[in-house]
Amino acid sequence: MAIFYDDPLERLNQPIKTKSYRKKQVVQRVHVFIFDNWKLILLGILNLIFLIIAIVFAILFFVGSADCAQLPDYTTSPASQLTTSAISSRTSEVQTNAITTTQGTPSNKTSTTTPSTSKVICASGFTLVGTKCGKLVSSNQPRTEADSICKGYGGSTLFSVRNEQETRDMLDFVKDSNIDFLWTGLVCNQTARTSCIWDVKSGTTADYNNFADGFPNVVYGYCIYFIVTGNSAGQWGSEQCSQLMNFVCELPTTIRDPDCKYNYNKNCYIRFDITLTIPQAQRFCNEKGADLVSIHSANENRFILTIYDIHGQILLGGLAPAVDFIVWLDGSPTTYSNLLYFYDTRSCVLMTVARGGPYDGDWYTMNCNVQEFFLCKRAIDF
């Protein structure tokens, strides 16, 4: 609404909205905005700081590794029982990539070998079951022992069922085996169906379950079995983990590579029992067309443990500027972490290998000048 002044002097006495006044209003609005949104602004600043730290850390790390341009003469470990795994060394090896890819009954000793033109394979002794590889073990074992036996087969786990198709695939796989029940890789510590967890924390039953009526039931037990025969075939029940049952071990498919001893999930792992620092080991692996190993699942972590028969540590190709922040040297994203021991002043990541003992598979940070055995990893070309 317009304001009229009877006296011209009164008009002159009114405050004039100068540029400084408008600037003051802008400052006030900015102040109010910051006050109302300070949490979001602080979160953004922290994320930016973490990003800058990671970039600076990576730059300093590789600049510091320049002193390693001339690598020392590599000496093998004094542990005489260890065998140096060079890429070209394949004599007297078990060929883990001799496989079968046709679905067949596990009770039948014969199997159809894939033609040489097929590259998608299963490890030796495993059969293609849908999109995964399975090995039926016709030996009644308590659940813990069954899991241990599976681990001995290339780090495999007790089988999982994540959808209806996988249920049908498993029933077809064991239909002629004369088996009624199988241990699965599922454990339920509560009665709620969504509370169950697959082995090595590889998922839950939140998206799919096929429990029979009244299950899971912790009164019967925490371990889950798969029903093979009868009207309830394909459904799941609960049982004491000490109960004896047959079981199926599971591995992912991979790609044929006759030059690879340790072949898992379309990657080749090359073990070197020589002691280097992480910068030196990364350069060494690069010269072999690979990278220092990165790990992206609990299943992969489990597989790597089967490569080693020692008590000690191996280098991983990771840097940890923060407990929940790992940068892999091969540039792959961080989708999994088993970093249990983090030290602020130590940023290079190592893994304990202890042949099933305490801390087996645990990760921890250490000074980057420490020298240990290491594992290279390269993708297998399809």
Curated annotation (Swiss-Prot):
PROSITE patterns: C_TYPE_LECTIN_1, C_TYPE_LECTIN_2. One of its GO terms (cellular component) is membrane. SMART domains: CLECT (SM00034). The keyword Cytoplasm does not apply. Pfam families: Lectin_C. It is a single-pass type II membrane protein. Disruption phenotype: Suppresses motor neuron dorsal guidance defects in an unc-6 mutant background. Mild shorter and stouter phenotype. This is C-type lectin domain-containing protein 38. It comes from Caenorhabditis elegans.
